């Protein structure tokens, strides 16, 4: 079963699966900042949600770089949220959680991606 439009793009009516990429999964990454009132000036904030957004954007850049270098991979953020028990319109979030699944065809490439993740 083809899960992406790659067959249509290639003009191929059928294909044979020749492998399954390996993966590294991080089911729960927590970014810890500091809860604060909405009135706190930006320079004093430790906004965990913005840090999560920065991480997501950095992962997208990493993915684009890998593909541009001819190294296919996949990066999926399945969960991306502040903590429900702390949700409030006027609170700078002090905690943020996400899940991450990184995939690549070669074990060495996957290890390199994990190192790059830790460098973000």
Predicted features along the sequence, with ranges:
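Midchain, well-structured core segments that form catalytic/ion-binding scaffolds
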Residues: 1-108
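Short amphipathic alpha-helices in soluble, non-transmembrane regions
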Residues: 112-120
